[in-house]
């Protein structure tokens, strides 16, 4: 349940959530497994998985949702080889070359035949809807997967006035200044990882890991025009993460001390523990995002 990445959206129109109404809206788009002829299926599932029984889990006007995706694993090479074999056989029998339309029809036929025997894989993606800061935080490092979830949510509830989080000042400009000065705004602390990139195609990319970023070797790249596009940071004593110039927050890692904040509850009641951890995580993520927005100079005005 602890988020590992953040793709952040903000509402560009005031948005509130009625939990009961949202629950009913999501019920029409619940996940169901692939049938023999389905390539993939995507739908909402219980927010707390096997420990929950609602699609929306709400606490303190913070709303957790989850979607499950099942995909059939049908390697393109398998289809290609089967198609080539079938085409060769038919062309030999008919004594002519098959047209593209005929090959496309054969490909569809082969796919239909192979689908029932294909293995499948499942994945889940969660999002935190936060009316109090007018944002949605998606636990994904993939912009495409985040957009897929937002599209499903929009389809379910009818409207979702959101835009990706963006800032008044380019993020790479701020990150470069922090690295150049070896100083970050409180409560952030710079760690030992960064990626610098040149604006020109010829300039290249340089990555540093487990290295003191204040060393001249690192700063020399800024002097020749490279900018910082990824920077590892720590938020107070609670969360380590990688901030990127596209506003993605990746590799979230909550400290053991922070995660132990609810250890006094034990694990005898899984639902109670999940609910407590959800509250703990939600509050810290809100604090983190608000601090990032302030440190980077504020959000870009919405259109």
Curated annotation (Swiss-Prot):
Transmembrane segments: none annotated. Keywords: Cytoplasm, DNA recombination. GO terms for biological process: DNA recombination; regulation of DNA recombination. One of its GO terms (molecular function) is double-stranded DNA binding. GO terms for cellular component: bacterial nucleoid; cytoplasm. InterPro entries: RdgC. It is found in: Cytoplasm, Nucleoid. PANTHER family: RECOMBINATION-ASSOCIATED PROTEIN RDGC (PTHR38103:SF1). Belongs to the RdgC family. May be involved in recombination. This is Recombination-associated protein RdgC. It comes from Shewanella piezotolerans (strain WP3 / JCM 13877). The lineage of its organism: Bacteria, Pseudomonadati, Pseudomonadota, Gammaproteobacteria, Alteromonadales.
């Amino acid at each position: 349940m602890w988020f590992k990445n953040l793709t952040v959206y903000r509402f560009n129109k005031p948005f509130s959530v009625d939990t009961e109404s949202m629950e009913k809206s999501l019920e029409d788009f619940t996940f169901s497994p692939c049938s023999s002829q389905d390539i993939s299926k995507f739908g909402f599932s219980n927010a707390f998985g096997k420990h929950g029984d609602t699609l929306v889990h709400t606490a303190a006007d913070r709303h957790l949702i989850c979607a499950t995706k099942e995909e059939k694993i049908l390697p393109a090479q398998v289809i290609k080889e089967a198609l080539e074999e079938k085409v060769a056989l038919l062309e030999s029998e008919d004594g002519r070359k098959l047209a593209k339309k005929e090959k496309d029809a054969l490909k569809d036929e082969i796919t239909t035949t192979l689908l029932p025997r294909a293995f499948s894989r499942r994945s889940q993606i969660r999002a935190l809807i936060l009316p109090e800061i007018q944002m949605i935080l998606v636990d994904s490092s993939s912009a495409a997967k985040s957009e897929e979830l937002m599209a499903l949510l929009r389809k379910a509830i009818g409207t979702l006035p959101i835009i990706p989080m963006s800032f008044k000042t380019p993020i790479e400009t701020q990150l470069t200044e922090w690295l150049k000065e070896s100083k970050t705004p409180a409560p952030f602390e710079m760690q030992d990882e960064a990626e610098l990139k040149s604006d020109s195609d010829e300039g290249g990319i340089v990555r540093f890991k487990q290295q003191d970023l204040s060393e001249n070797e690192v700063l020399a790249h800024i002097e020749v025009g490279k900018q910082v596009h990824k920077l590892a940071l720590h938020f107070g004593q609670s969360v380590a993460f990688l901030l990127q110039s596209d506003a993605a927050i990746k590799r979230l890692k909550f400290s053991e001390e922070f995660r132990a904040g609810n250890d006094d509850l034990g694990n005898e009641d899984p639902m109670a523990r999940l609910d407590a951890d959800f509250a703990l995580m939600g509050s810290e993520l809100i604090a983190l995002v608000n601090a990032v927005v302030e440190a980077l100079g504020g959000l870009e005005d919405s259109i």
